[in-house]
Amino acid sequence: PSSNNKQEKEKLNAIQKANEFAIEIPLEVISHCLRIIELSEELIDNGNPNLVSDAGVSAEVSLAGVRGAAMNVLINLIGIDDDSYCNKKRELVNKFINDAEKNWKIVFDKTMKKIIL
């Protein structure tokens, strides 16, 4: 609890910093998930043919990881008052989601083509 304006400002500042920190981990998760989707495509193209479905599943799970981590970022942005910061993070998250979905689709199509034929 805060008993005066100074304490209230300090409390709000601490909450802002905590929310900013809480955003960094899911952004890192997104980065790793994007890389896994890329590696999944490499496995499908160059890996053991028996791993094709495993590579496809890894892309599926990684897409879910991107989306889930993105939701964590977005919920934490609600507690941040810096509009410029929030807009940059929203744009970054949208880019990551779009990239993940685009790359996932490539992996999905390649996976299905190899396991159906």
Language model segments and positions:
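Secondary-structure capping and boundary motifs in well-ordered enzyme cores
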Residues: 25, 29, 51-54
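Hydrophobic alpha-helical bundle architecture
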Residues: 43-51
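Membrane-helix exit/interface motif
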Residues: 1, 38-41
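Conserved helix-loop functional segments at active or binding sites
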Residues: 42, 113
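Long, amphipathic alpha-helical stalk/connector segments used for oligomerization, subunit docking
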Residues: 1-27
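Preference for long, well-ordered alpha-helical segments
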Residues: 36, 51-111, 117
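Long, amphipathic alpha-helical coiled-coil segments characteristic
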Residues: 28-38
